[in-house]
Amino acid sequence: MRTASKKWLMSLAFVLPALALAQGGADFGKYEYYAKCASCHGESGKGDGKVAEYLTKPPADLTTYAKRNGGVFPTQLAWDVIDGRPVAIGPHGTREMPVWGQEFRRETVRPADRLDPKGPSPEWFVSRRIAALIDYLASIQVK
């Protein structure tokens, strides 16, 4: 009985954020942005975060991502940079920016590996977090 309760609670710990994410990706993305990106890129995304002055390379102005790409938000490039697996160092510069996909995996895998194997994989949760963050970044683009 105790094991079933633990599994149920662990499942709930992942289902509730997933439901919140499904109902408001940009809101969840904003939360992810403030938690993971704002210290370097600033609360407004302009690259003026509290630790920006201490970095060797200034953080990018994320509000002009679409403008710098011919007016189209580069969703795949944003995904690749955040996830960190398929992207070469070139488009991003150095890897001063943390590989958030790897960090999201680290945060997710520990509890998720105890969930029902028939449920969503840890990778599903990671991809939802990255997608929400990208939705938020797309929403703060200047015209």
Language-model-detected regions and their locations in the chain:
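Stable alpha-helical elements in mature extracytoplasmic
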Residues: G25, Y33-K36, P74-L77, G93, ...
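Bacterial N-terminal signal peptides that target proteins for export
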Residues: M1-L12
